[in-house]
């Protein structure tokens, strides 16, 4: 069937909400994804009308990709790690800089099954947002999912 998705219904419902609400505001989004590997962009593009909202997405799984594609400082990654609010915010700022979006969202995390630490166990995910309206304060959140 043409309308079925391989993505979970809950994810599609959230993506629909993102598309509808941002479309109503006339707002364009850019994504900088690491641990999700493009899944957020895939979910958004499942929604009719997403082309009015999604400007572009960057999948920067490796530290090198974060540095080369988004301009994240190697020193920032060395100091705080790839899974940190500082790095995620730099990813969001880089996505904003390299796009025509009004808002950029970045996601980085420890997907597992290996790679976790006592401070950042497997399942730790960091979200950050940057806006083009001149906001200069980091807006991010770290969660254990």
Residue ranges and their predicted role:
Residues 1-145:
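Short alpha-helical segments enriched in small residues
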């Amino acid at each position: 069937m043409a309308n079925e998705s391989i993505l979970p219904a809950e994810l599609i419902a959230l993506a629909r909400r993102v598309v509808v609400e941002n479309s109503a505001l006339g707002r364009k989004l850019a994504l900088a994804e690491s641990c999700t590997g493009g899944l957020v962009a895939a979910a958004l593009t499942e929604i009719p009308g997403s082309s009015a909202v999604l400007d572009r997405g960057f999948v920067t799984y490796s530290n090198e990709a974060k540095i080369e594609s988004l301009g994240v400082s190697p020193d920032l990654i060395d100091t705080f790690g790839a899974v940190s609010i500082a790095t995620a915010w730099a990813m969001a700022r880089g996505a904003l800089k390299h796009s025509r979006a009004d808002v950029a969202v970045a996601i980085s995390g420890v997907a597992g099954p290996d790679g976790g630490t006592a401070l950042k166990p497997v399942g730790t995910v960091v979200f950050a947002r940057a806006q083009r309206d001149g906001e200069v304060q980091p807006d991010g959140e770290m969660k254990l999912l």
